[in-house]
């Protein structure tokens, strides 16, 4: 066994572990997006329409997020209101 083979084999292992880690991150990200309900964009649009009846806002001033913690789901609504 030559000294260069030692470094070459070690590099292959580290490359494989880096690839595995990246794949795990991608899979976790995809799973997180899949758990988001399909109705959230429609809900956000309807909320903007209702809020516009009372306050002049743009659609990007309303953010809707759904978080799950165990068996409990939390709907978070953030509205940036204009100054008077």
UniProtKB/Swiss-Prot annotation:
Q: Does the keyword Chloroplast feature in the UniProt annotation?
A: no
Q: Would the keyword Ribosomal protein be found if you checked this record's keyword annotation?
A: no
InterPro entries with a match to the protein in the record: MinE (IPR005527), MinE_sf (IPR036707)
Q: Please provide an example of a Pfam family that matches this protein in its UniProt record.
A: MinE
GO biological process terms, alphabetically, are:
cell division; regulation of division septum assembly
Q: Which UniProt keywords apply?
A: Cell cycle, Cell division
Q: Looking at the record's lineage, which domain of life comes first?
A: Bacteria
| Family named by the database record | Belongs to the MinE family.
Q: What does this protein do?
A: Prevents the cell division inhibition by proteins MinC and MinD at internal division sites while permitting inhibition at polar sites. This ensures cell division at the proper site by restricting the formation of a division septum at the midpoint of the long axis of the cell.
Protein name as catalogued: Cell division topological specificity factor
